[in-house]
């Protein structure tokens, strides 16, 4: 689960991290009031969306020379006028895709005199079962660009949760960022604070970009992104309360109600599969045959008829879907349950696009019989390759 920047900074501030003063605003009046509280002389008006690249982003409906989603201004009236222009508009960045995201809230923050910019993040390293720390002197840039152009400027080390942060980690961070003296001590303190927050709140990722050195030689968290392990939210009601569903795909929200693993993509072929590995393989083979998947959808191993019906309805709710591939390898999951769910969903919502079904495993013959006797126009597939080839051909033939 992701949260907004202003929420992320509030969470980090609870653990002592040095963040600038700021206030969230949902209206131009609230933005102006926030600026008055801060007092100036410099204010930063920040769009709050779950995507990066806000500063270089473009608002729909404004000219090509218009400012982006992060603006530096010098008066309360400028804060108000910029808020009026930004709120309610769609901001398009390299991370939002062409559809962009509507800006429904702003973060009004005090300005900062920047001497240096760094990148710092903590994330779960699944390979080592440790917390990986990534640091770079190239702050304020996309870390992916740094990794591509100057990979030698990215430094990583891991922290073992069994032992926590040690002085050797402090020295590694100071060396990676080129810090000495008082700044090295501040970096050590910050690492302690961030690691404590990361572990206490079950974070999946903590990213600060940029972490700055101010003109008076202190570290400050200028931007922060936090992502939390969704499976841990039951023990963090304070974090769960920060969820902003307007930033999420409505289909993904609906899928979560049925414990379905669903991620919307930009393609045209909807996929319903059991098992994450098989789902990824299904998406790969669709691309191999010249089309693009419209989603990742794993119904899991213990899906009921109702769950399968819900999954099918979520797929068909996407207007971009021009065909559907159901690919089930029944182990724990029974093929007859999938068949009954698909039929129930088709009868309820109708079938306006080609549907290819590949079943294999537990109760496969019964599943195939249920589908063949349903009277529905379903294309049967013998294996995964056959299924992908048939759905791609059906979609291209329907154009």
Curated annotation (Swiss-Prot):
Q: What are the names of the required cofactors?
A: Mg(2+)
Q: From which residue to which does any coiled coil extend?
A: none
Outline the extent of the ATP-grasp domain. 9-254
* Biological processes annotated in GO: succinyl-CoA metabolic process; tricarboxylic acid cycle
Instruction: Name the keywords, alphabetized.
Output: ATP-binding, Ligase, Magnesium, Metal-binding, Nucleotide-binding, Tricarboxylic acid cycle
Enzyme class (EC, first level) = ligase
Q: What Pfam families has UniProt attached to this entry? A: ATP-grasp_2 (PF08442), Ligase_CoA (PF00549)
Which residues make up the binding site for Mg(2+)? 209, 223
S-adenosyl-L-methionine among keywords: no
Subunit text: Heterotetramer of two alpha and two beta subunits.
Q: What does this protein do?
A: Succinyl-CoA synthetase functions in the citric acid cycle (TCA), coupling the hydrolysis of succinyl-CoA to the synthesis of either ATP or GTP and thus represents the only step of substrate-level phosphorylation in the TCA. The beta subunit provides nucleotide specificity of the enzyme and binds the substrate succinate, while the binding sites for coenzyme A and phosphate are found in the alpha subunit.
Protein name as annotated: Succinate--CoA ligase [ADP-forming] subunit beta
Q: Which gene encodes it?
A: sucC
């Amino acid at each position: 689960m992701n949260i907004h920047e202003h929420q992320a900074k509030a969470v980090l501030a609870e653990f002592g991290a040095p963040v600038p003063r700021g206030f969230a605003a949902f209206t131009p009046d609230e933005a102006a009031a926030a600026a008055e509280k801060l007092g100036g002389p410099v204010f930063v008006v920040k769009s709050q969306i779950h995507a990066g690249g806000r500063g270089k982003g473009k608002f729909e409906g404004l000219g090509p020379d218009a400012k982006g989603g992060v603006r530096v201004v010098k008066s309360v009236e400028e804060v108000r006028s910029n808020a009026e222009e930004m709120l309610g508009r769609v901001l398009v960045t390299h991370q939002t895709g062409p559809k962009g995201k509507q800006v429904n809230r702003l973060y009004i923050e005090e300005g900062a005199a920047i001497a240096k910019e760094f990148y710092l993040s903590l994330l779960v390293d699944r390979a080592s079962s440790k917390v990986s720390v990534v640091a770079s002197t190239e702050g304020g840039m996309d870390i992916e660009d740094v990794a591509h152009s100057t990979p030698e400027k990215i430094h990583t080390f891991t922290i073992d949760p069994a032992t926590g942060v040690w002085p050797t980690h402090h020295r590694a961070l100071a060396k990676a960022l080129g810090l000495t003296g008082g700044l090295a001590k501040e970096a050590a303190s910050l690492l302690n604070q961030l690691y404590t927050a990361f572990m206490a709140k079950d974070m999946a990722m903590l990213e600060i970009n940029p972490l700055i050195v101010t003109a008076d030689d202190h570290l400050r968290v200028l931007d922060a992104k936090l992502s939390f392990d969704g499976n841990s939210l039951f023990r963090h009601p304070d974090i769960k309360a920060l969820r902003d569903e307007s930033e999420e795909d409505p289909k993904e929200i609906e899928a979560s109600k049925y414990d379905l693993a669903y991620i919307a993509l930009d393609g045209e072929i909807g996929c319903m599969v059991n098992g994450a590995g098989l789902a990824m393989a299904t998406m790969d083979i669709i691309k191999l045959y010249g089309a693009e998947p419209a989603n990742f959808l794993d119904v899991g191993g213990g899906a009921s008829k109702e769950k399968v019906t819900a999954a099918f309805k979520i797929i068909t709710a996407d207007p971009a879907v021009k065909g559907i591939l159901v690919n089930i390898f029944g182990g724990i999951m029974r093929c007859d349950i999938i068949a009954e769910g698909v039929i129930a969903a088709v009868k309820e919502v109708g079938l306006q696009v080609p549907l290819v079904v590949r079943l294999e495993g537990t109760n496969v013959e019964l599943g195939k019989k249920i589908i063949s006797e349903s009277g529905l126009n379903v294309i049967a597939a013998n294996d995964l390759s056959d299924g992908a080839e048939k759905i791609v051909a059906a979609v291209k033939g329907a154009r």
